């Protein structure tokens, strides 16, 4: 028989084993875990079992181990992080196997609920498009420049464009088409399309296209005939049905902003029945929130204003709000009445240019914009902060 000392030794060993087992459960794979996979290539791994913010953190922490054995990552396209992440996310999208539950969207945001947040300056993120989707941001944007009358490059400043790798098709429309094809492979119903959010496939992603070049007519032509054509042909873009006089919602809703064309003659390509003569208009205008007219209920799905313009309209100043640390009751009442007017036209609203520093001011104003004013899209650069405010 075992003595007291022997029993204690066995008991202690058992406790240590149990503690080790439970400590490994519920945690994300670590660098130590990946040391066991040094000889494996990321191209041999289909699913890490992580989504959303946890997936982003995992890739950032383990990037060296995820890419060091892959020769193709020696020459970057966007960045090492982006290239490796995109390779992992879109791997199954190129296969012929139809399995939406193991799709890119499942990897990105399974168990992540869509949030009413606009991914401001999304193209500046380390993972354009993908980071916003991983957080569940229901709106994104891309600034586009017309290069050589045939390429739409994405970027904020014309001096720092890359018309080879940082283009609208490579960063946005191409990946969108791939991931939407994955989750719509089983459904032949033309009137039913699954979107980019696993937990809410009926939610449409607002996609703002900010026109930067002077020739907005040519930019629009490139959008319709080149960059959005495959998404249109696949039934993935929201459109205004001219015959039924109603908006038909689809997985992606394109909103034109910035220096966009406003003439219906341009928007409909000189036709009475739409750009492609299908009685459909596939792009909506970013309506001016401070000067709305009834016509925008058909031309738009959202209205926008800057925070400074809104405060000025309400007889105040954004600096006063910043110094005070919050909007007062008069400012809230005025701004809310304007947003209510947009809602009466069935338009969503977005307020951009709110204070970005310090953090406590950003949080206070953001909460007021969403909860007190009733605005629909929180316009923030920091998606982590945004997720905690909704």
Swiss-Prot record:
It comes from the Eukaryota. Residues 1-17 form the signal peptide. The keyword Transport does not apply. GO terms for biological process: lipid metabolic process. Keywords: Signal. InterPro entries: AIM6_PI-PLC-like_dom, HAT_RTT109-like, PLC-like_Pdiesterase_TIM-brl. Disruption phenotype: Impairs respiratory growth. GO terms for molecular function: phosphoric diester hydrolase activity. Belongs to the AIM6 family. This is Altered inheritance of mitochondria protein 6. The gene is AIM6.
